[in-house]
A protein has these predicted regions:
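Active-site rim helix/loop that mediates acceptor-substrate recognition in acyltransferases
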Residues: 2-14, 18-19
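ATP-dependent carboxylate-amine ligase catalytic core
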Residues: 93-96, 100-111, 137-223, 239-241, ...
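Extended acidic/charged loop-beta regions that coordinate divalent cations
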Residues: 191-240, 272-309
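C-terminal helical cap/extension that packs against the catalytic core
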Residues: 268-278, 283-287, 297-300, 367-368, ...
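Nucleotide phosphate-binding/pyrophosphate-handling subdomain across enzymes
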Residues: 112, 201, 206-209, 219-229, ...
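Acyl-donor binding region in acyl/amide transferases
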Residues: 33-72
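Short functional linear segments
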Residues: 73-120, 127-140, 145
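Conserved beta-strand in the GNAT
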Residues: 22-31, 35-37
Length: 483
């Protein structure tokens, strides 16, 4: 296995082993040359192995000096065209059935990846990022799948810190667009599929998948992980997941697989009971986060978890549990011999981790902080860290299906200087409806509200929908870099 791993890394090969009870065939495919270098087994096994490579090959392939033609189109030239085309298709039903059938046609190649699966209401992206940074420090190549996009559509799929290549998306779309239409799979399912292919092509050591919505019916639930992780349970996406903590916990418990252990940072007993029941049915172990000790608030929060003294490069208190959950997961993987893990990698990786849009200081003068607190629990956690800020002024916007009354009331506990805005999104709430009867300012154009920052003194906190934060971040960075 170690030889295979190094071979993959150094030469960018895909090695596929046909395995029943015993290994009875192997194929080696060079993804740079598009050449099958080796194929061993009986004639029947060889045909099966070649069929797998033909299915995932993006271009004509060479085998024994002969060309095997791969059918592909020239429909797309730029990755933006791919997304525009997919968005034009009809709405898809929130179900995993079609995607399961689709992946069966691809021999369930996702099972070749060593995955970690992360669900939860808040903190998923941060937890993924903390794990990725520590694994990177340990020398591993790590693929991550997170959503929604914050900086670019490309940042959903990354290897270490590099976004997926635009041309890869174009090549995959031209190769498989007819299959997408045939199975009527959704944009999110297509993104998951592209990530699976990309991680296989690039030979990642590990892939970490963040659930998009819920758990059981989410497209990421197509993977077979080494371990499943839950950050917490909050009241969000209630139209899809139900309007109680219990119903949301049941939806998220849907990622629990047979004999795959489940680690959670959730504290509410009614949710933990649901996780425990599901784990028992799945013959999986439920693992809960240990107590966190010696917490120190400040510019860099500090704490002790088990025997590790951790310092985070953020004042955001909510990142303590996210990073501790990441650490607990990595310690589990080490204990069960999935990974090697040194203390230096843990300490350095957790400290160096940064995640855009989560208590992100984007400017020092004036002090501007971005935070994607987009639901009740998110705003509660934001309050804990933001209450120490002085002369605070808030700019806020949200989607219309969120509990915006609660969110604004909580923000008013921090300051009465709040401006509500709008942003471009089909579900964006109008500034007027956001404001209601609350003592807040209304400025529909968020750009005008941001421009006004530079005419005032104080500390500025911009918060709400992650889609809003994405737009704000782009605008502010352009403004900062133009000075």
């Amino acid at each position: 296995e170690e030889i295979t791993k190094e071979y993959l890394k150094q030469n960018q090969k895909i090695i596929y082993i046909n395995e029943n009870q015993n290994i009875n065939g192997v194929i080696i495919f060079d993804v740079i040359k598009n050449e099958i270098e080796l194929c061993l087994g009986t004639d029947e096994i060889k045909q099966q192995l070649i069929a797998v490579i033909k299915k995932i090959a993006l271009k004509d392939i060479v085998y024994q000096n002969k060309i095997i033609q791969i059918k592909t189109k020239k429909q797309f030239k730029h990755y933006e065209e791919v997304y525009d085309f997919i968005h034009q298709q009809k709405d898809r039903v929130y179900s995993l059935d079609n995607f399961k059938k689709y992946m069966q046609e691809f021999y369930n190649i996702q099972h070749a990846l060593k995955c970690i699966h992360v669900c939860g209401t808040n903190g998923k992206g941060s937890t993924v990022n903390y794990m990725k940074e520590v694994l990177k420090k340990q020398g591993y190549i790590v693929g991550t799948f997170t959503s929604p996009a914050l900086i670019s559509r490309l940042d959903v799929v990354r290897i270490n810190d590099e976004w997926i290549k635009e041309q890869f998306i174009v090549d995959v779309a031209n190769r498989y667009v007819d299959n997408w239409l045939k199975y009527e799979i959704s944009l999110f399912e297509i993104e998951v599929f592209i990530s699976i292919l990309y991680f296989i092509y690039q030979g990642v050591d590990y892939a970490i998948y963040e659930v998009g919505l819920g758990g059981e019916l989410d497209a990421t639930n197509i993977i077979l992980p080494m371990v499943c992780v839950n950050t917490n349970i909050g009241l969000d996406h209630m139209d899809y997941l139900g309007d109680s903590y219990e119903s949301i916990a049941r939806a998220k418990a849907g990622i629990i697989k047979d004999h795959v252990d489940f680690i959670t940072g959730e504290h509410k007993q009614e949710c933990v009971d649901i996780f425990r029941d599901t784990c028992e049915k799945r013959h999986s172990h439920l693992i809960r986060l240990d107590r966190i000790h010696d917490l120190q608030d400040g510019e860099n929060v500090k704490y002790t978890y088990k025997d590790y003294n951790i310092v985070l490069n953020t004042p955001a208190l909510y990142q303590i549990e996210n990073s501790a959950l990441a650490l607990e997961t990595l310690l589990y993987l080490k204990k069960h011999h999935f990974i090697e893990l040194d203390e230096s990698s843990i300490v350095e990786g957790l400290f160096e981790a940064k995640w855009a849009g989560r208590f992100e200081i984007i400017s020092e003068k004036p002090l501007i902080i971005l935070d994607g607190a987009h639901n009740r629990e998110g705003v509660d956690e934001l309050y804990r860290s933001a209450r120490k800020l002085h002369n605070l002024k808030i700019i806020f916007s949200a989607l219309r299906d969120k509990d915006t009354d609660y969110m604004i009331e909580r923000l008013l506990d921090l300051t009465y200087d709040i401006t509500v805005c709008e942003f471009k999104h089909p579900r964006s709430q109008s500034a007027k409806l956001l404001a209601g009867d609350y003592p807040v300012k209304i400025e529909p154009d968020f750009r005008k509200a941001l421009d006004d920052i530079y005419l005032q003194e104080g500390t500025f906190l911009i918060t709400g929908s992650l889609y809003f934060i994405s737009e704000v971040r782009k605008y502010l960075l352009q403004k900062i870099h133009s000075k």
